[in-house]
Amino acid sequence: MGAALPDFPKASYEAGTYALGNGAFAYLQPDGGWGFSNSGLVTDSGEALLIDTMFDFPHTRAMLDGFRAASPAKIRTLVNTHQNGDHWFGNALVEDAEIVATARAASAMAHETPDLLAGFLKAAPGMGLTGEYFLHCFGRFDFAGATPKLPDTTFSGRLTRNVGTKIVELIEVGPAHTGGDAIAWVPADRTVFTGDILFINGHPIVWAGPIGNWIDACNMIIGLDAEIVVPGHGPVTDKEGVARVRDYLAYIRDEAKKRYNTGMKPFEAARSIALDDFAGWGDAERIAVNVATLYREFGDTTAPSDAATLFGWMAQLWKDKK
Protein backbone atom coordinates (compact mmCIF):
# COMPACT_ATOMS: atom_id res chain seq x y z
CA MET A 1 0.00 0.00 0.00
CA GLY A 2 2.97 2.31 0.47
CA ALA A 3 3.22 3.04 -3.25
CA ALA A 4 -0.20 4.68 -3.15
CA LEU A 5 0.87 7.19 -0.51
CA PRO A 6 1.87 10.74 -1.37
CA ASP A 7 5.60 10.84 -1.97
CA PHE A 8 8.05 13.43 -0.68
CA PRO A 9 8.83 15.99 -1.98
CA LYS A 10 5.92 16.15 -4.44
CA ALA A 11 3.14 16.32 -1.84
CA SER A 12 2.20 19.49 -0.03
CA TYR A 13 2.34 19.77 3.75
CA GLU A 14 -0.87 18.01 4.70
CA ALA A 15 -1.79 15.73 7.58
CA GLY A 16 -1.14 12.04 7.17
CA THR A 17 1.33 9.38 6.17
CA TYR A 18 4.08 9.97 3.61
CA ALA A 19 6.17 7.31 1.87
CA LEU A 20 9.80 8.43 1.90
CA GLY A 21 11.09 5.49 -0.14
CA ASN A 22 12.80 2.18 0.64
CA GLY A 23 10.31 1.30 3.36
CA ALA A 24 10.59 4.53 5.35
CA PHE A 25 7.57 6.65 6.26
CA ALA A 26 6.70 9.89 8.01
CA TYR A 27 3.48 10.91 9.71
CA LEU A 28 2.97 14.68 9.69
CA GLN A 29 0.63 16.89 11.73
CA PRO A 30 0.21 20.41 10.35
CA ASP A 31 0.57 23.15 11.30
CA GLY A 32 3.50 21.87 13.32
CA GLY A 33 2.78 24.26 16.19
CA TRP A 34 2.49 23.45 19.89
CA GLY A 35 1.86 19.71 20.30
CA PHE A 36 1.49 18.92 16.60
CA SER A 37 4.59 16.80 16.11
CA ASN A 38 5.79 14.26 13.55
CA SER A 39 6.56 10.54 13.77
CA GLY A 40 8.65 8.23 11.62
CA LEU A 41 8.61 4.55 10.72
CA VAL A 42 11.55 2.49 9.44
CA THR A 43 10.64 -0.93 8.02
CA ASP A 44 12.44 -3.91 6.56
CA SER A 45 11.84 -7.67 6.39
CA GLY A 46 8.57 -7.47 8.30
CA GLU A 47 10.05 -5.48 11.19
CA ALA A 48 9.61 -1.83 12.10
CA LEU A 49 11.11 0.86 14.32
CA LEU A 50 8.88 3.77 15.30
CA ILE A 51 10.27 7.21 16.04
CA ASP A 52 8.08 9.07 18.57
CA THR A 53 4.43 8.84 19.52
CA MET A 54 2.01 11.75 19.75
CA PHE A 55 0.80 14.10 22.47
CA ASP A 56 -2.36 12.20 23.39
CA PHE A 57 -4.03 8.88 22.72
CA PRO A 58 -6.43 10.08 19.98
CA HIS A 59 -3.61 11.57 17.89
CA THR A 60 -1.39 8.54 18.54
CA ARG A 61 -4.14 6.17 17.39
CA ALA A 62 -4.51 8.14 14.18
CA MET A 63 -0.77 7.94 13.58
CA LEU A 64 -0.60 4.20 14.26
CA ASP A 65 -3.59 3.59 11.98
CA GLY A 66 -1.85 5.55 9.24
CA PHE A 67 1.33 3.55 9.55
CA ARG A 68 -0.54 0.22 9.69
CA ALA A 69 -2.26 1.10 6.43
CA ALA A 70 1.13 1.85 4.91
CA SER A 71 2.98 -1.21 6.19
CA PRO A 72 2.04 -4.38 8.08
CA ALA A 73 5.49 -4.53 9.67
CA LYS A 74 5.56 -5.26 13.41
CA ILE A 75 6.87 -2.41 15.56
CA ARG A 76 9.60 -3.99 17.67
CA THR A 77 11.36 -0.80 18.81
CA LEU A 78 10.01 2.63 19.75
CA VAL A 79 12.47 5.51 20.00
CA ASN A 80 11.53 8.66 21.92
CA THR A 81 13.74 11.47 20.66
CA HIS A 82 13.37 13.54 23.83
CA GLN A 83 11.28 14.22 26.91
CA ASN A 84 8.54 16.57 25.67
CA GLY A 85 5.13 14.93 25.91
CA ASP A 86 4.20 15.47 22.28
CA HIS A 87 6.84 12.86 21.44
CA TRP A 88 6.03 10.17 24.02
CA PHE A 89 2.68 10.54 25.82
CA GLY A 90 1.20 7.98 23.40
CA ASN A 91 3.76 5.27 24.21
CA ALA A 92 1.27 3.04 26.01
CA LEU A 93 -0.55 2.36 22.74
CA VAL A 94 2.53 0.71 21.24
CA GLU A 95 2.42 -2.80 22.68
CA ASP A 96 5.27 -5.29 23.01
CA ALA A 97 7.95 -2.89 21.79
CA GLU A 98 11.25 -1.99 23.37
CA ILE A 99 11.17 1.74 24.21
CA VAL A 100 14.48 3.56 23.86
CA ALA A 101 15.53 7.07 24.87
CA THR A 102 18.62 8.80 26.17
CA ALA A 103 19.24 8.43 29.89
CA ARG A 104 18.74 12.17 30.37
CA ALA A 105 15.42 12.13 28.54
CA ALA A 106 14.15 9.10 30.45
CA SER A 107 14.98 10.73 33.78
CA ALA A 108 13.00 13.85 32.86
CA MET A 109 10.08 11.87 31.44
CA ALA A 110 9.43 10.35 34.86
CA HIS A 111 8.44 13.82 36.09
CA GLU A 112 6.77 15.33 32.99
CA THR A 113 3.61 13.25 32.78
CA PRO A 114 0.19 13.65 31.11
CA ASP A 115 -1.43 14.15 34.53
CA LEU A 116 0.76 17.18 35.14
CA LEU A 117 -0.30 18.80 31.89
CA ALA A 118 -3.94 17.88 32.44
CA GLY A 119 -3.75 19.65 35.79
CA PHE A 120 -2.43 22.82 34.18
CA LEU A 121 -5.23 22.73 31.62
CA LYS A 122 -7.83 22.35 34.36
CA ALA A 123 -6.39 25.35 36.22
CA ALA A 124 -5.90 27.47 33.09
CA PRO A 125 -9.30 29.28 33.10
CA GLY A 126 -8.34 30.92 36.39
CA MET A 127 -4.82 31.92 35.33
CA GLY A 128 -5.59 35.08 33.37
CA LEU A 129 -3.60 35.76 30.21
CA THR A 130 -1.15 32.94 30.90
CA GLY A 131 -4.03 30.49 31.18
CA GLU A 132 -5.58 31.80 27.99
CA TYR A 133 -2.31 31.26 26.18
CA PHE A 134 -1.88 27.80 27.69
CA LEU A 135 -5.31 26.81 26.40
CA HIS A 136 -4.40 28.25 23.01
CA CYS A 137 -1.33 26.01 22.93
CA PHE A 138 -2.69 22.80 24.44
CA GLY A 139 -6.47 22.99 24.68
CA ARG A 140 -7.00 20.84 21.58
CA PHE A 141 -5.49 17.75 23.20
CA ASP A 142 -7.21 15.13 25.34
CA PHE A 143 -5.07 13.66 28.11
CA ALA A 144 -7.87 11.68 29.75
CA GLY A 145 -6.68 8.15 30.48
CA ALA A 146 -3.23 8.78 29.04
CA THR A 147 -1.11 6.55 31.25
CA PRO A 148 2.63 7.20 30.90
CA LYS A 149 4.84 4.40 29.62
CA LEU A 150 8.51 5.13 30.18
CA PRO A 151 11.55 3.83 28.27
CA ASP A 152 12.95 0.47 29.31
CA THR A 153 16.28 0.96 27.51
CA THR A 154 18.41 4.07 27.90
CA PHE A 155 21.68 5.15 26.38
CA SER A 156 24.26 7.90 26.33
CA GLY A 157 26.29 8.80 23.27
CA ARG A 158 25.27 6.33 20.57
CA LEU A 159 23.21 3.19 20.19
CA THR A 160 22.30 1.09 17.15
CA ARG A 161 19.23 -0.98 16.44
CA ASN A 162 18.64 -3.37 13.56
CA VAL A 163 15.43 -3.34 11.54
CA GLY A 164 15.67 -6.34 9.25
CA THR A 165 18.87 -5.68 7.31
CA LYS A 166 18.85 -1.95 8.06
CA ILE A 167 20.84 -0.26 10.80
CA VAL A 168 19.33 2.68 12.69
CA GLU A 169 21.92 4.84 14.43
CA LEU A 170 20.63 6.67 17.50
CA ILE A 171 22.84 9.66 18.27
CA GLU A 172 22.57 11.77 21.42
CA VAL A 173 22.91 15.45 20.54
CA GLY A 174 21.57 17.08 23.71
CA PRO A 175 21.41 18.96 25.86
CA ALA A 176 20.07 21.36 23.25
CA HIS A 177 16.30 21.76 22.77
CA THR A 178 15.89 19.72 25.97
CA GLY A 179 18.31 17.93 28.22
CA GLY A 180 18.19 14.60 26.40
CA ASP A 181 17.77 15.08 22.64
CA ALA A 182 18.60 12.33 20.15
CA ILE A 183 18.31 11.85 16.40
CA ALA A 184 17.77 8.65 14.39
CA TRP A 185 19.91 8.22 11.26
CA VAL A 186 19.09 5.48 8.73
CA PRO A 187 21.96 5.27 6.23
CA ALA A 188 20.23 2.70 4.01
CA ASP A 189 17.33 5.12 3.51
CA ARG A 190 19.47 8.30 3.42
CA THR A 191 16.93 9.60 5.94
CA VAL A 192 17.35 11.22 9.34
CA PHE A 193 14.62 11.77 11.93
CA THR A 194 15.66 14.72 14.05
CA GLY A 195 13.04 15.12 16.76
CA ASP A 196 12.86 18.71 17.93
CA ILE A 197 16.36 19.59 16.86
CA LEU A 198 14.40 20.83 13.85
CA PHE A 199 11.27 22.94 13.75
CA ILE A 200 10.61 23.74 10.09
CA ASN A 201 8.64 26.94 9.42
CA GLY A 202 8.19 27.41 13.16
CA HIS A 203 10.32 29.10 15.79
CA PRO A 204 12.46 26.59 17.70
CA ILE A 205 12.27 26.76 21.48
CA VAL A 206 15.44 26.43 23.53
CA TRP A 207 14.32 24.91 26.82
CA ALA A 208 17.77 23.71 27.84
CA GLY A 209 20.71 24.75 25.70
CA PRO A 210 23.53 25.46 25.44
CA ILE A 211 22.66 26.81 22.06
CA GLY A 212 26.11 25.88 20.75
CA ASN A 213 25.19 22.21 21.16
CA TRP A 214 22.09 22.77 19.05
CA ILE A 215 24.10 24.51 16.33
CA ASP A 216 26.59 21.63 16.45
CA ALA A 217 23.70 19.17 16.09
CA CYS A 218 22.50 20.98 12.97
CA ASN A 219 26.00 20.82 11.51
CA MET A 220 26.17 17.11 12.33
CA ILE A 221 22.88 16.49 10.51
CA ILE A 222 24.15 18.40 7.48
CA GLY A 223 27.33 16.31 7.59
CA LEU A 224 25.34 13.07 7.41
CA ASP A 225 24.48 14.00 3.83
CA ALA A 226 20.93 12.74 4.22
CA GLU A 227 18.61 13.17 1.26
CA ILE A 228 15.49 13.36 3.44
CA VAL A 229 15.23 15.10 6.82
CA VAL A 230 12.12 14.54 8.95
CA PRO A 231 11.83 17.25 11.62
CA GLY A 232 10.07 17.04 14.95
CA HIS A 233 7.61 19.68 13.74
CA GLY A 234 6.81 20.96 10.27
CA PRO A 235 7.18 19.63 6.73
CA VAL A 236 9.83 17.18 5.56
CA THR A 237 12.94 19.05 4.49
CA ASP A 238 16.55 18.70 3.36
CA LYS A 239 19.95 20.14 4.26
CA GLU A 240 18.84 23.65 3.32
CA GLY A 241 16.11 23.47 5.93
CA VAL A 242 18.63 22.35 8.54
CA ALA A 243 20.92 25.25 7.67
CA ARG A 244 18.03 27.68 8.03
CA VAL A 245 17.35 26.52 11.60
CA ARG A 246 21.05 26.68 12.41
CA ASP A 247 21.22 30.24 11.10
CA TYR A 248 18.21 31.24 13.20
CA LEU A 249 19.87 29.91 16.33
CA ALA A 250 23.11 31.75 15.58
CA TYR A 251 21.20 34.95 14.87
CA ILE A 252 19.25 35.00 18.13
CA ARG A 253 22.40 34.08 20.07
CA ASP A 254 24.29 37.02 18.60
CA GLU A 255 21.40 39.46 19.01
CA ALA A 256 20.77 38.39 22.60
CA LYS A 257 24.46 38.74 23.44
CA LYS A 258 24.52 42.32 22.14
CA ARG A 259 21.64 43.21 24.43
CA TYR A 260 23.07 41.31 27.38
CA ASN A 261 26.30 43.26 27.03
CA THR A 262 24.38 46.56 27.30
CA GLY A 263 22.57 45.46 30.47
CA MET A 264 19.15 45.09 28.86
CA LYS A 265 16.81 42.75 30.75
CA PRO A 266 15.93 39.47 29.02
CA PHE A 267 12.23 40.15 28.40
CA GLU A 268 12.92 43.54 26.87
CA ALA A 269 15.70 41.97 24.83
CA ALA A 270 13.28 39.37 23.50
CA ARG A 271 10.80 42.08 22.58
CA SER A 272 13.43 44.09 20.72
CA ILE A 273 14.98 41.40 18.52
CA ALA A 274 13.81 41.81 14.92
CA LEU A 275 12.43 38.61 13.44
CA ASP A 276 11.64 39.94 9.97
CA ASP A 277 13.81 37.31 8.28
CA PHE A 278 11.63 34.63 9.88
CA ALA A 279 8.29 36.40 9.47
CA GLY A 280 6.57 33.36 7.99
CA TRP A 281 7.46 31.11 10.92
CA GLY A 282 4.87 30.28 13.56
CA ASP A 283 5.01 30.78 17.33
CA ALA A 284 7.30 33.81 17.30
CA GLU A 285 6.62 34.38 21.00
CA ARG A 286 9.04 31.54 21.78
CA ILE A 287 11.80 34.12 21.42
CA ALA A 288 11.07 34.95 25.09
CA VAL A 289 12.14 31.49 26.24
CA ASN A 290 15.11 31.47 23.89
CA VAL A 291 16.47 34.75 25.18
CA ALA A 292 15.95 33.75 28.82
CA THR A 293 17.89 30.53 28.19
CA LEU A 294 20.65 32.46 26.43
CA TYR A 295 20.89 34.99 29.25
CA ARG A 296 21.36 32.16 31.75
CA GLU A 297 24.04 30.76 29.47
CA PHE A 298 25.73 34.16 29.39
CA GLY A 299 25.80 34.23 33.19
CA ASP A 300 22.61 36.03 34.23
CA THR A 301 21.55 34.15 37.35
CA THR A 302 18.29 36.12 37.55
CA ALA A 303 16.96 35.06 34.13
CA PRO A 304 13.94 32.81 34.75
CA SER A 305 13.82 29.12 33.98
CA ASP A 306 10.47 28.22 35.58
CA ALA A 307 7.61 27.34 33.24
CA ALA A 308 5.12 29.71 34.88
CA THR A 309 7.23 32.80 34.22
CA LEU A 310 8.29 31.72 30.75
CA PHE A 311 4.73 30.94 29.65
CA GLY A 312 3.71 34.30 31.08
CA TRP A 313 6.33 36.03 28.96
CA MET A 314 5.27 34.13 25.85
CA ALA A 315 1.63 34.95 26.59
CA GLN A 316 2.44 38.64 26.68
CA LEU A 317 4.26 38.55 23.32
CA TRP A 318 1.44 36.45 21.87
CA LYS A 319 -1.08 39.05 23.03
CA ASP A 320 1.04 41.88 21.62
CA LYS A 321 0.98 40.40 18.11
CA LYS A 322 -2.73 39.45 18.10
Which ranges hold each PLM region?
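Ligand/cofactor pocket segment of small-molecule handling proteins
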Residues: 157-159, 163-221
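Conserved beta-strand hairpin/beta-sheet module of binuclear metal-dependent hydrolase folds
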Residues: 17-66, 182-195
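Active-site neighborhood of phospho(di)ester-bond hydrolases with catalytic His/Asp-centered motifs
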Residues: 51-53, 76-82, 100-102, 173-174, ...
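Active-site metal-binding motif and surrounding structural segment of the metallo-beta-lactamase
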Residues: 45-48, 58-101, 222-224
